[in-house]
Amino acid sequence: MNHIHEHLKLVPVDKIDLHETFEPLRLEKTKSSIEADDFIRHPILVTAMQHGRYMVIDGVHRYTSLKALGCKKVPVQEIHETQYSISTWQHKVPFGVWWETLQQEHRLPWTTETRQEAPFITMCHGDTEQYLYTKDLGEAHFQVWEKVVASYSGCCSVERIAQGTYPCLSQQDVLMKYQPLSYKEIEAVVHKGETVPAGVTRFNISGRCLNLQVPLALLKQDDDVEQLRNWKQFLADKFANMRCYTEKVYLVEQ
């Protein structure tokens, strides 16, 4: 377990970039929970980028909450490319006016035609599937993606469903499916100072550290030297009680 020690770090909040936007309601819930606990339970998962910067691949709402709570640095676990794969979340959304609006948007060339190329966006309602293809959208496909997700995420409850699973849908449900981006595509978006829609990209990560419970007081310290000393002692105390499970486990989240 020695390698985990090297990958747990304290990183200044201004050295971290986000690849996706946050969901306001979820952010408030996460922030309130962290504030009530007075600690951050799980470290934020990041990948290293150029010039000493990091990109969050899991923990956008935790990072944004810590920043809002006045933390100078945040606890991260650096994840390497061999530890993750990228997929997407499907969105199960209640049928509503947003669907009608998307149907009538002339800049969205919906089609029921199936092609050799995978559709960029798939919208399922009843027995009908409609598609948007990257080739038809051209360079505007990222803007279209943002527009489609924004059409329902601000007004409806969204249930995230793992890619490749087939939920039971009623006539009152719409299932939105999205094609995953590659890491290089996501990194390119971040380098331009942009983000992808919230709650769509999913990093499937192995070897994550859970239940570290880093106190907010440690993260808010102004003295960098003292903070680093306290961080090292904190990790030493935690590692004395750390276990690594190699077998499959089932965790019930509270």
UniProtKB/Swiss-Prot annotation:
It comes from the Bacteria. Its EC number is 2.7.1.225. The active site is at residue 20. Disruption phenotype: Mutant is impaired for staphyloferrin B production. O-phospho-L-serine binds at residues 57, 59, 61, 98, 229. Gene3D superfamilies: Conserved hypothetical protein from pyrococcus furiosus pfu- 392566-001, domain 2, Conserved hypothetical protein from pyrococcus furiosus pfu- 392566-001, ParB domain. GO terms for cellular component: chromosome. It catalyses: L-serine + ATP = O-phospho-L-serine + ADP + H(+). One of its GO terms (biological process) is siderophore biosynthetic process. Binds heme and heme binding inhibits DNA binding. Pathway: Siderophore biosynthesis. Keywords: ATP-binding, DNA-binding, Kinase, Nucleotide-binding, Transferase. CDD domains: SbnI_like_N. Changing residue 20 to A: Loss of kinase activity. Induction: Up-regulated under iron-deficient growth conditions. Repressed by Fur under iron-rich growth conditions. Transmembrane segments: none annotated. GO terms for molecular function: ATP binding; DNA binding; kinase activity; phosphotransferase activity, alcohol group as acceptor. NCBIfam families: staphy_B_SbnI. Forms dimers and tetramers in solution. Predominantly forms dimers. Dimerization/oligomerization is not essential for kinase activity. Free serine kinase that uses ATP to phosphorylate L-serine to yield O-phospho-L-serine and ADP. O-phospho-L-serine serves as a substrate for SbnA and is a precursor for staphyloferrin B biosynthesis. Is also a DNA-binding regulatory protein that senses heme to control gene expression for siderophore biosynthesis. Binds to DNA within the sbnC coding region and is required for expression of genes in the sbn operon from sbnD onward. PANTHER family: CHROMOSOME-PARTITIONING PROTEIN PARB-RELATED. This is ATP-dependent L-serine kinase SbnI.
